[in-house]
């Protein structure tokens, strides 16, 4: 259990909230590192650009599926000109846009049990379960990004975050915002994290309002769109929202309205995406097996297996993706 005093003093309950945010298999006193890090792919992606937009769903540690897909794309010279991500998808997008093969997997499978990255140290420093300060100031020094490529204007990157005042998803694009702050907002898990303030406005995880940031690709007029899901195609969410939301976010009625509709909107969106995929309008990839990884899972073998599932699913479907991009 974690005790979070005053975790949401900006417009929500202060005091003490007790929440379990780790799986039963975790031992927060012991730092665990995946034993087969040396088998993960590594290197730099080619400079080749692929016209189109990559849309990345969130999902906590389920995002390792996305990381596997992205590494396979880079290994095969498929580097989309536009990427939009939500929550874990926003974090995964950094390594892809900067062309760092294996970057996301090495971070998650090395630092998952480091409390500064995920745990008490992160809560103390950043007010939430993910250690963004540790990620952007320490981890990136150990596993550097190609900043020149990341800042290249020919490679668009946008992330979505939920505006607590309007209750709507907003998109922040590289070159037009403080990208690290926007990514932090996009991946700030509700209930266990303080909102991130951007220009005086509080934001939380993009998934609170919109779990798959597909609308950005439509607004941008993209002709070719690839969507990466983090749950199997058959997955649907139950209507409603956690009762805790009505207590913690009672000062934000628009947010509560959005959260109350989010699961139904998600179900409608995934149905629409499947229809567009069947019609050849988009390319959709999702886990070929049911995903057993939980939001805060700490089983390193399960996490690594999900990464390799993403990598191998994408490898198997490369001919279909190339055919879609070429038509």
Task: Locate each region found by the language model.
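Patatin-like phospholipase
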Residues: 24-86, 94-327
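Short, positively charged and aromatic/hydrophobic N-terminal segments
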Residues: 9-12, 16-20, 27
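Aromatic (phenylalanine/tyrosine) cluster motif
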Residues: 2-3
């Amino acid at each position: 259990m974690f005790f979070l005093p005053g975790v949401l003093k900006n417009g929500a309950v202060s005091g003490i909230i007790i929440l379990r945010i780790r799986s039963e298999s975790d031992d927060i006193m012991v730092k665990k590192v995946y034993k087969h890090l040396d088998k993960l792919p590594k290197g730099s992606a080619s400079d080749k650009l692929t016209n189109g937009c990559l849309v990345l769903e969130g999902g906590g540690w389920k995002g390792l599926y996305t990381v596997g897909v992205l590494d396979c794309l880079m290994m095969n010279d498929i580097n989309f000109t536009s990427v939009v991500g939500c929550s874990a998808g926003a974090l995964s997008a950094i390594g892809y846009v900067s062309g760092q093969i294996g970057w996301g997997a090495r971070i998650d499978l090395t630092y998952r049990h480091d409390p500064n990255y995920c745990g008490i140290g992160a809560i103390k420093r950043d007010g939430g379960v993910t250690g963004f300060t540790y990620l952007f100031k320490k981890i990136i020094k150990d596993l550097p990004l190609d900043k020149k490529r990341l800042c290249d204007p020919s490679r668009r990157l946008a992330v979505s975050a939920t505006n607590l005042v309007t209750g709507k998803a907003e998109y922040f694009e590289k070159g037009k915002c403080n990208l690290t702050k926007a990514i932090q907002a996009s991946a700030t898990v509700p209930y266990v994290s303080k909102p991130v303030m951007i220009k005086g406005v509080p934001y939380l995880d993009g998934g609170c309002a919109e779990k798959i940031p597909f609308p950005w690709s439509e607004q941008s007029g993209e002709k070719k769109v690839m969507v990466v899901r983090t749950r199997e195609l058959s997955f649907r969410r139950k209507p409603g929202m956690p009762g805790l939301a009505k207590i913690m976010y009672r000062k934000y009625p628009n947010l509560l309205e959005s959260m109350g509709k989010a699961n139904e909107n998600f179900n409608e969106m995934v149905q629409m995406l499947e229809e567009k995929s069947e019609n050849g309008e988009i390319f959709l990839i999702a886990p070929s097996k049911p995903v057993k990884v939980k939001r805060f899972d700490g089983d390193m073998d399960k996490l690594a297996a999900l990464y390799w599932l993403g990598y191998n699913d994408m490898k198997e479907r490369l001919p279909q993706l190339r055919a879609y991009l070429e038509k």
